C-alpha cells in the first residue's frame, strides 16, 4: 500500500546523507567541533545548547548524552540544554521569545564555554541572539544549520551545514547523526 512512499523517503534520506558526505569540509568541521568541545571540557568549561522545535529536542538529546551516556559508561561531561520551562516561560513573557536563549547564556555562560546553536534554516532569531550573547561572554560557537546557512552563516567558529533545500526533517536527520558522531569523538578526545 505505502511501499513506494517508504522506499522514496528512505532513498531521499540516503541521498541527503550522500550529498553531505561529498563535501570534505563537513568531515573536517565535525572533527574540529569535537576537539573544540573536548578542549573546553578539559579546561573546566561547559557546553550550552539551544534550538527550536525539533532542533530543541536535538539540543536536549545532545546534552543528555553528554551528561548521561552514549554507547558506553564513562564520566558525565558538563552540558546544559537551554530547556527549562520556567525560564523559557518567564523570559518569553517578560522579555520576548527572541530572548529565551540569550538571557540564559548571559546568566551562566563563561569565557571558555561553548554554545551549540541548532537551526535548520539558520534564521532562528532567538538562536542568533544567543550567539551574540555567547560572543559577549567570550564563548566559542558551533552551529548546526541547513540550506544556505541563513542569517547564521558565518557567525560561528565552526558551522556544520546540511545543504538541503527541501523539508527540514531531512536536515534534522543529518543533524542527529552529526550529534552522535560529535559525542563519539568527544569521548575519544577525553580519553587521551
From Swiss-Prot:
Residues reported in the UniProt entry to bind substrate: 52-54, 65, 93-94, 119-121, 124, 172
GO molecular function, one term: zinc ion binding
Catalytic function, reaction form: 2 D-sedoheptulose 7-phosphate = D-glycero-alpha-D-manno-heptose 7-phosphate + D-glycero-beta-D-manno-heptose 7-phosphate
Co-factor binding details: Binds 1 zinc ion per subunit.
Classification via Pfam families: SIS_2 (PF13580)
Function, in words: Catalyzes the isomerization of sedoheptulose 7-phosphate in D-glycero-D-manno-heptose 7-phosphate.
Other remarks on this protein: The reaction produces a racemic mixture of D-glycero-alpha-D-manno-heptose 7-phosphate and D-glycero-beta-D-manno-heptose 7-phosphate.
Name of the protein described by the UniProt record: Phosphoheptose isomerase
Native organism: Escherichia fergusonii (strain ATCC 35469 / DSM 13698 / CCUG 18766 / IAM 14443 / JCM 21226 / LMG 7866 / NBRC 102419 / NCTC 12128 / CDC 0568-73)
Taxonomy of the source species: Bacteria, Pseudomonadati, Pseudomonadota, Gammaproteobacteria, Enterobacterales
Name of the gene encoding the protein in the UniProt record: gmhA
